[in-house]
Design a protein with these regions (language model features):
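Active-site rim helix/loop that mediates acceptor-substrate recognition in acyltransferases
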Residues: 2-31, 36, 158-184, 188
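A short beta-loop-alpha structural element at the N-terminal edge
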Residues: 4-13, 127-154
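Conserved GNAT acetyl-CoA-binding A-motif
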Residues: 76-89, 234-245
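C-terminal "cap" of GNAT-fold acetyltransferases
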Residues: 23, 28, 105, 109-138, ...
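A short, internal acetyl-CoA/4′-phosphopantetheine-binding micro-motif in the GNAT/acyltransferase core
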Residues: 50-62, 88-90, 211-218
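Conserved beta-strand in the GNAT
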Residues: 24, 30-39, 47-49, 54, ...
């Protein structure tokens, strides 16, 4: 039997420069599923994304998804893409196993937790204050470097890593420290700054966009305090859930988030082509 991809629409060109196309997955000409491919809106035309891959229930467990995924890689190679990315829901075990078997590498996970019960209280001696205008520039530069290096360590070329970082800052901090949907805080312990927090406050969720403990202050529980601060600020804003992204291999952060009740919602993987 032959598994192929059959286009069901012309190649689409979005106003943002993203190309996309939907395909039927066919076995000997018989439709058994569907797939949608696109270029990446942030990394540009050299990076592709699986938007969707679906195989009909009766045709699963026969290798259709594997062949369709490999055929999709050939399609985007023809578009000039050099990397492909996919996001998999936490409970889609079959899809995660398939991606891993095909050589996709886990870059990061999205974690989240519901906000229930009493608002967290910071430990004695710890207080929070807004990031000042004078502190904003150095904080932004340090965060830019940190995030870009995380991306580079996870397979993103340098130019793309910095471009994505800058795009995120422009989108989420359009007015700098005064951006309406951002809360930028400094954590102090006994009057000394020990860390910073960038919390996004959006209609549907709160999101920890950056959290950093000063290197010389690590190992003293300030990271946990910063996360409690994030929960307290989110609850104060009326949010019912809080999320974050953690890069694969950041074991201390993973352990901290797990101990605080965060659970995986999705996995983000990539593969060089």
């Amino acid at each position: 039997m032959t598994t192929t991809l059959r286009p069901v629409e012309p190649l689409q060109h979005g106003a943002d420069g993203v190309r996309s196309r939907r395909y039927q997955v066919c076995v000997n000409g018989r439709p058994v599923g569907g797939i949608r491919l696109s270029t990446h809106p942030e990394y540009g035309p050299s990076v592709a994304r699986f938007q969707d891959l679906r195989i009909d229930e009766r045709d699963r467990r026969r290798g259709r998804g594997t062949v369709a995924a490999l055929a999709a890689e050939e399609v985007v190679r023809g578009w000039g893409c050099r990397r492909i990315e996919i996001s998999v829901p936490y409970d889609a075990g079959t899809a995660l196993r398939l991606a891993t078997a095909l050589g996709y590498v886990l870059r990061s996970r999205t974690l989240a937790k519901p906000l229930k019960g009493a608002r967290p209280v910071l430990p004695a001696g710890s207080t929070a204050r807004p990031l000042t205008a004078a502190e904003f520039g150095p904080w932004l530069a340090g965060g830019r470097e940190r995030f870009a290096r995380h991306l580079m360590a996870a397979g993103v070329p340098e130019a793309q890593a910095y471009a994505k970082t800058d795009e995120g800052h422009a989108r989420f901090l359009p007015d700098g420290a005064a951006s309406r949907e951002a809360r930028l805080s400094v954590l102090e312990h006994e009057g000394t700054p020990v860390g910073t927090l960038w919390l996004g406050l959006w209609p549907e969720t709160a999101y920890v966009l950056d959290v950093e403990t000063a290197p010389e202050r690590r190992g003293r529980g300030h990271g946990r305090t910063l996360m409690l601060l994030a929960e307290a600020q989110a609850a104060e804003h009326g949010e019912e859930r809080i999320g974050l992204n953690v890069f694969e291999g950041n074991v201390p952060a993973e352990r901290l988030y797990e101990s605080l009740g965060y659970r995986a919602e999705s996995y983000h993987l990539y593969k060089p082509l």
